[in-house]
Amino acid sequence: MAVTVGIVIGAGILRTPGIIAGHLGNPWIILAAWFFGGVVVALSTLVLAEMAAALPEAGGKYVYARHAWGDTMGFLAGWSELLVSRGFSGAAKAVAIAEYLRILTGDRGSIRLFALAVCVAFFFLHTRGLEASTQFQNVTTAIKVLVVIAIAGAGLWAGDLVGFQPSVTSASGPTAGLLGFALAYQSISFAYYGWEDAAKMAAEVKNPGSALPKILVGGSLAVMVLYLLMNVAFLSALTPEEMAGSDLVARDAIAAVFGGTAGTVVVVASLLILVSSLNVNFLGLPRVAYGLSQHGLAPEAFSKVDAQGTPRNALYFISLWIALLALSGAFELLIRFMMTVAITVDTMVLMGYFKLRRSQPDLERPFTMPGHPLLPAITIALYIGILAILIWTQWQLALGAGAMIGAILLAGWITTRRATGAAADTTHGR
């Protein structure tokens, strides 16, 4: 449970509440949306956990997609995680850090330049090797959970529930209806993203049949409760309209009840959380690229490791990619694009649950999804419904996301075809 909380909590809960309040407006709808997101995550984690326990190989969603749908779909899952799910999220976190640094400097300086400087700093940290970056992560992970609990507790203790007053409960966001839901859900799903990493523990858990539901659902529900408490704390000090105008709701909420100095302390504490969250991207992404290269799905140069154990070429590539995306300075656009692609790919991966049930019925499954087939079917139906709403309400963004998915699929088809041809030539040569 603690692992799930540590993985998931990060930039999302600090940067997105204002965006979500702006799209939804009503405090009860805001809380309902966060609750809905937590339920979807809990169900998704259980579906993925069955595949993770049955296929205990390194690679995560790439492995599940490859076994269910073949090498090309495995390529899509792996490269979409590398370029989009982790690359775009890393850029969004760098932009958020830049926004908060700009707050601390009195709104001086360029967000784009701050974001670039952040990426350069992380690049040099990770050239020092795995030990230095891991120690950094261990310290900041412990801090961020304490900070989130402290912010929620302070807001709940000192606030007067101003956001729930009758005068504001009838407010509606500027993007009401399906579009408002779609825009808000993209931000909420970004805040919960990381749940799929928690599911990877399935292969390492003793007695997965009894332990996994408690670990995975318990962890997801713990994150959901923390997020709901944070939002209640924010709404105790600010109206939805005040939240909507804020890039750092936590600071403004604490400042409203404790004063500006306390708000500045929250900015510094929030920076620690964001730095910890971005460190996960720089820590994991080069190793995702390394893993893809080991399977012949990425350039061989990515598999070269330096004396410190760092896949240096992969680190160069990832750092450059995140820095280029961060130069956009557009936090919300980055996460909207990221989640449109991620939800599409995750739908495909989760559908692999039923494909594996049919194609490999005798596969040993240490953990089986409770409520089969109804609960997994409901989970996938929710994803398909959400995806349909995203496409319907944001067709231009969906076209861009579709173009990227199509490009990755084409590259995957070419790569796997070449690999098949090379294997055939080797066989004939013998």
Predicted regions span which residues?
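Membrane-interface "cap" regions at the ends of multi-pass membrane proteins
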Residues: 1-18, 22-28, 41-46, 57-58, ...
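Hydrophobic transmembrane alpha-helices that form the core helical bundles
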Residues: 19-22, 41-119, 123-127, 270-291, ...
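Helix-loop-helix junctions that connect adjacent transmembrane segments
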Residues: 27, 31, 108-110, 138-267
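TM-loop-TM module centered on a large, flexible mid-protein loop between adjacent transmembrane helices
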Residues: 63-64, 70, 102-106, 171, ...
